[in-house]
């Protein structure tokens, strides 16, 4: 979910990593050698994979506060790889704009893993900026990836990406001060004027407003996008919308400045735990579904270690620790069974393990490309900056 970590914080997980290192190390030994080439646009980068087991240094770029404390040191202990874990992604667009000049030259700024939203991964695949995964190096991904995430339209064989976490965008309310907010349309009710926050994410906020208008985001035309933006603009200009936020809406809910917000499922889990008055509500129109994916950029200096990392975090025991900390939807099968024993409350939470019936009216992030994308982003940015 793009931009989801800006300005916010996460509760620290309470369970330390418990991993059977022998199993992990055996799987890591499958990392492959050889070479592959990646072409796209005007870029052609030759990638040479390290031979044998992973070693050396691995540089990872991820969003802030998106991993528990134990996973990185456990990976280092299991593999001997030295990890430089950078929490330097605060916006998909900002990070891409920073990296694009390097990627166009077949360089990655020393990084071997990025974690980016589906739409950005799709863009980078088309540009030829990503390496294809060697499936023999990531057997746990093949074995344990949730069925619902195995064949996204932008990467149907998961040749270039492995989900890091998934989640939902919907409504978080103060159930005492906004008891009757159940839909996106309810956020436009004048009784809540000046008490509503909207996300500053065009690919989540605008499609949700489309759903309020009865439009299927997956079939939306440019006119549908513009009509929804116009509705948001009117609400912003009238003062109905208090402000547009990243996940700093958490502070607004906590201090009472907002009574209802468009927000993310993982934040809702954490907010509810700290304040029982706050509650996630699945919009009657349905939510937006998203994932953020691990990818290996062209020019990655250590793709073997990158694949070893992907394989490691797809061990259910490892992923269970991550899930306990971040509280988003885990992409790994087998995690629920582990948490049923050590954290039953999380295991039964629909926001972490949503059923098909729970998300039946939800929609994936719709595509935006080319001239249409430029027009939509320009129009939405004008509202944000208005």
What do these predicted regions represent?
Residues 1-57, 386:
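Short, low-complexity disordered leader/linker segments with a strong preference
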Residues 121, 197-201, 205, 209, ...:
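Ligand-binding pocket segment of bilobal, Venus flytrap-like solute-binding proteins
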Residues 297-360:
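Mature extracytoplasmic/periplasmic domains
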Residues 356-386:
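Conserved C-terminal helix/tail region of periplasmic/extracytoplasmic solute-binding proteins
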